[in-house]
Design a protein with these regions (language model features):
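N-terminal and secondary-structure boundary signal
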Residues: 1-268
Length: 268
């Protein structure tokens, strides 16, 4: 498997994203071939969709002000967080643990990093549909059948640093199910599933960086995935709360687990 960093110009609201990517590939002499996987940050997709919010135009509610005071957030950011998140569980200073589109993420995916001063970026409106449309547009403009993976940075419990998380996939199966297979010693596997899209997201995320690298896209060649014509969002990659080892342990109404102070009982 080979990964190529795709540096682009600064993407602005309303830019034609596919044209920006194809222009960058051509400039860097990176050939686009069938069964390549184009990995895009959620932010570059959100920019093209105009998913930027000017904080000075947000009016915080009393609930948002309370949340902001508790976790040292801007009240305007807290208001957006309450609007964007499906669930709010708790948090630490500057970060609130939320459920957004079936993904556990900080601050409902809202980010001021690499956004214009005074603005924040939201997640794409519909990442699954965006991945599908980008894939179709690339095929129309180049004749190449590629897959598209939209990612963001995420966190793993009790681990330092960010990892890549898949928000949507078009063109390959995001999860490989090992249940029913046998291991080296002939023992049957009962719960193992391989997070293919998340693993590719982490590989791409490592090359993209988190600061001023200007690498919002990665082209992956020879990836060991099961290509298809499907499009997949969080629903196809989400683990039900009652089957999730973390959530079923820490949320009391998700099973016979004990309540943990600071986390309120909740499920989607």
């Amino acid at each position: 498997m080979r990964l190529y960093a795709v540096k682009t110009r600064l993407v602005k609201v309303g830019d034609k994203l596919v044209d920006v990517i194809l222009e960058a590939l051509k400039k860097q002499n990176i050939p686009l071939e069938n069964n390549d996987i184009l990995v895009l940050t959620s932010k570059i997709v959100a920019y093209a969709e105009g998913r930027l919010v000017k904080l000075s135009e947000v009016k915080p509610s009393e609930k948002a002000k309370e949340l902001a005071e508790k976790f040292s957030l801007q009240p305007e950011l807290a208001e957006l967080l309450l609007h964007e998140a499906e669930k709010v569980y708790g948090g630490v200073e500057k970060a609130v643990l939320t459920l957004k589109n079936g993904v556990l993420t900080a601050n409902a995916g809202i980010d001021n990093k690499n956004a214009p001063i005074g603005y924040v970026a939201l997640w794409p409106q519909n990442a699954k549909e965006a991945a599908k449309q980008i894939r179709e547009e690339i095929k129309r403009k180049t004749g190449k059948v590629v897959a598209v993976l939209i990612i963001d940075s995420g966190l793993a419990p009790l681990r330092k640093g960010t990892v890549g998380v898949a928000l949507a996939v078009a063109g390959f199966k995001p999860v490989e199910d090992y249940r029913g297979r046998k291991d080296l010693y002939g023992k049957q596997l009962f719960i193992t599933q391989h997070a293919v899209a998340d693993n590719l997201a982490s590989a791409a995320h490592m090359m993209m960086g988190e600061a001023a690298e200007k690498i919002p896209a990665i082209l992956i060649k020879d990836a060991p995935v099961d290509f298809d014509e499907g499009s997949y969002g969080s629903a196809e990659m989400e683990m039900p709360i009652r089957e999730c080892i973390f959530m079923s342990t820490f949320l009391s109404d998700a099973g016979n687990s004990k309540r943990v102070k600071g986390l309120r009982s909740s499920e989607p």
